[in-house]
A protein has these predicted regions:
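Proteins with a high burden of low-complexity, intrinsically disordered sequence enriched in S/T/G/P/A and R
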Residues: 1-3, 10, 146, 164-165
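Acidic/polar alpha-helix N-cap and adjacent early helical turns
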Residues: 156-165
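A structured beta-alpha segment of the ubiquitous adenosine-cofactor-binding alpha/beta core
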Residues: 36
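AMP-binding/adenylate-forming catalytic core of the ANL superfamily
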Residues: 9, 14, 19-20, 29-30, ...
Length: 165
């Protein structure tokens, strides 16, 4: 069990949690621990007030120039910036690297942070292949009832590359 606002894997247990996948023992074994905890595959945190905040999918991976990169890792780095309210990363096609990260950022109220500021923030702190090639500022996220619909972010106008070839 983690402390308030610490990120971790969301796991659920209780009489209302399903007992397994119909006719799929392997999927059931992957989803449920031996003592009945269901692993959602989501990363989240629990506030002091008891509210769960969704941060991303554990399996949301990009393949950048042959390197496996967790979108959540890049998001966590940019979420640590004092002027970033929320960030989301999706992979977009790239002729040179196959796929590159595109960063979507909602700035905190009153923030004037620029794309260039975010690139400077990341250089020398995270690996170059993890630095977003595109940055889009956004205030209105495409949402389901509970999560950002990342697949819809891929349809946004990314603008010009801000880093790399």
């Amino acid at each position: 069990v983690l402390g308030p606002d610490e990120k971790g894997l969301i796991e659920i247990k209780g009489k209302h949690v399903f007992s397994g996948y119909l006719n799929d023992k392997k999927a059931t074994e992957n989803a449920l621990s031996s003592d009945g905890w269901f692993s959602s595959g989501d990363i989240g945190s629990l506030s002091k007030e008891g509210h769960i905040r969704f941060h991303g999918r554990l399996k949301d991976m990009l393949k950048v120039g042959g390197e496996n990169v967790a979108a959540l890792e890049i998001e966590a780095y940019f979420d640590s910036h004092e002027e970033v309210l929320i960030s989301q990363v999706v992979g977009v096609d790239d002729d040179h690297l196959g796929e590159v990260p595109a960063l979507f950022v909602e700035r905190k109220p009153g923030s004037k942070i620029s794309k260039e500021d975010l690139i400077v923030f990341s250089k020398g702190q995270i690996s170059n292949f993890k630095i977003p090639r595109y940055i889009v500022f956004i205030d209105d996220w495409p949402m389901s009832s509970t999560k950002v619909q990342k697949f819809k972010l891929k349809n946004f106008d990314l603008g010009e590359k801000v880093f790399g070839k």
